[in-house]
């Protein structure tokens, strides 16, 4: 047995699909594209989510969730965080560096027993302590 006698395993090599090469192939005339219409034309690509005229899934399902228009206040417990006590000046940017709170947060409220003692260090209008309004 030589290299010239080697063959691939039976069923491992598929015959390529040659479309539009005559009626005898079974894939002539319309070249497996069906009849006429938009999908038979070259360059046709359905939009993402298009379901052939049926109401798309993303429009059939109800909208969920609610993003309030009210201001978002982030609470930080001072008793659990010694790093805030060690700051000389408490600003919004310094608190953001310590606590990675989301960008949509508009204000910070310091809570806990020691929060009132830190009121003199606060240098930003967006920061309040418990007891302040």
From Swiss-Prot:
Q: State if Nucleotide-binding is listed as a keyword.
A: no
Q: Which GO terms describe its cellular component?
A: cytosolic large ribosomal subunit
Task: Report the domain of life of the source organism.
Answer: Bacteria
Q: Keywords of this protein's UniProt record, alphabetized?
A: Ribonucleoprotein, Ribosomal protein, RNA-binding, rRNA-binding
Write out the GO biological process terms. translation
Which InterPro entries does its entry note?
Ribosomal_uL15, Ribosomal_uL15/eL18_sf, Ribosomal_uL15_bac-type
Task: State one molecular function term (GO).
Answer: rRNA binding
Q: Where is this region: Disordered?
A: 1-64
- The answer to whether the entry has keyword Lipid metabolism is no
Per the entry, what this protein does is: Binds to the 23S rRNA.
Q: How does it assemble?
A: Part of the 50S ribosomal subunit.
Please state which protein family the record places this protein in.
Answer: Belongs to the universal ribosomal protein uL15 family.
Record's protein name: Large ribosomal subunit protein uL15
Q: Which organism is it from?
A: Helicobacter pylori (strain J99 / ATCC 700824)
Q: Could you read off the lineage of the organism from its UniProt record?
A: Bacteria, Pseudomonadati, Campylobacterota, Epsilonproteobacteria, Campylobacterales
């Amino acid at each position: 047995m030589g290299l010239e006698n080697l063959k691939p395993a039976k069923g491992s090599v598929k015959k390529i699909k040659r479309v539009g090469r005559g009626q005898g192939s079974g894939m002539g005339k319309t070249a497996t594209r069906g009849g006429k219409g938009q999908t038979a034309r070259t360059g046709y690509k359905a939009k993402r989510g298009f379901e052939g005229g049926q109401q798309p899934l993303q429009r059939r399902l109800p909208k969920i969730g609610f993003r309030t228009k009210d201001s978002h206040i982030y609470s930080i417990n001072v008793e659990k965080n010694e790093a805030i006590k060690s700051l000389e000046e408490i600003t919004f940017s310094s608190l953001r560096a310590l606590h990675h709170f989301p960008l949509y947060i508009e204000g910070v409220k310091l809570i806990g027993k020691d929060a009132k003692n830190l009121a003199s260090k606060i240098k930003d209008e967006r920061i309040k302590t418990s007891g302040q309004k």
